[in-house]
From Swiss-Prot:
One of its GO terms (cellular component) is cytosolic small ribosomal subunit. Pfam families: KH_2, Ribosomal_S3_C. Residues 39-107 form the KH type-2 domain. This is Small ribosomal subunit protein uS3. It comes from Campylobacter curvus (strain 525.92).
Length: 232
């Protein structure tokens, strides 16, 4: 079922950390989940052109810290950091709590699955051919060090009357290997013919714990020599 499940959720606690990091009580759980959803939806909409790849939310007993990882942090920060203060006030008003907002730069933006999906969506909305858009993103990811990338687009591609799914795969994307570090992103392109869904999987290599050796293949295993049978 590795082909069906979200690869990020499948690898939580193995080689992927949670994006919401807090320990709730039974009473506070629904409220915290609702606040996290509101914060992410608000920031994604407001800062769309900054290229947000991840939004981390951390809570302590009295404090709430939001870390925004973006490809273009300068757009968010503004002159002398004034835009960050305004953003902090907007988020605080949204949930009615004091919030601390930090901005981090996404060093390898082309190797981020979420940014890759949004890039394809933006090109499709500008009427770029879907195959050309997919190939351009794949080339960028490979230059950034990705070991494998798969892109899937589904909908009325090229204005066709019947919706279909097309995908490209370069390198290898082992979805069943839990130690494989796989990034996953989803986006939607709103075109005149309807919505087109985009999914991106990026394989960044295998993560092995200290002292754990990679599995040996049949070629690496020592071959057993058979002793000649003695005749009776």
């Amino acid at each position: 079922m590795g082909q069906k499940v979200n690869p990020i959720g499948l690898r939580l606690g193995i080689n992927r950390n949670w994006e919401s990091r807090w320990f709730p009580t039974k009473a506070s759980l629904p409220e915290n989940i609702g606040e996290d959803y509101k914060i992410r939806a608000f920031l994604k909409k407001k800062l769309y052109y900054a290229g947000i790849s991840q939004i981390l939310i951390e809570r302590t007993a009295k404090k709430l810290r939001v870390t925004v990882v973006a490809a273009r942090p300068g757009i968010i920060i503004g002159k002398k950091g004034q835009d960050v203060e305004n953003l902090k006030n907007d988020v605080s008003k949204l949930i009615g709590k004091e919030v601390n907002v930090n901005i981090k730069e996404e060093r390898k933006a082309q190797a981020s699955a979420q940014l890759a999906a949004e890039n394809v969506a933006m090109q499709l909305e500008k009427r770029v051919a879907f195959r050309r858009a997919m190939k351009k993103v794949i080339q960028g990811a490979q230059k950034s060090g990705a070991k494998g990338i798969k892109i899937s687009v589904a909908g009325r591609l090229g204005g066709a009357e019947m919706a279909r799914t097309e995908w490209y795969l370069e390198g290898r994307v082992p979805l069943h290997t839990l130690r494989a570090k796989i990034d996953y992103g989803v986006a939607e392109a709103h075109t005149t013919y309807g919505n087109i869904g985009i999914k991106v999987w990026i394989f960044k290599g295998e993560v092995l714990q200290k002292g754990v050796q990679p599995e040996k293949t049949e070629d690496d295993a020592p071959k057993k020599t058979r002793r000649p049978r003695r005749g009776k």
